[in-house]
From Swiss-Prot:
Implicated in the defense of plants against pathogens. It comes from the Eukaryota. GO terms for biological process: defense response. Belongs to the glycosyl hydrolase 17 family. It comes from Capsicum annuum var. annuum. Its EC number is 3.2.1.39. This is Glucan endo-1,3-beta-glucosidase, basic vacuolar isoform. It catalyses: Hydrolysis of (1->3)-beta-D-glucosidic linkages in (1->3)-beta-D-glucans. The keyword Hydrolase applies. GO terms for cellular component: vacuole. Keywords: Glycosidase, Hydrolase, Plant defense, Vacuole.
């Protein structure tokens, strides 16, 4: 859910 997850290309848990 952090920017690290976005860097890894994972769905952002903060948005989902």
């Amino acid at each position: 859910g952090s920017n690290i997850e976005v860097m890894l290309g994972l769905p952002n848990s903060d948005v989902k």
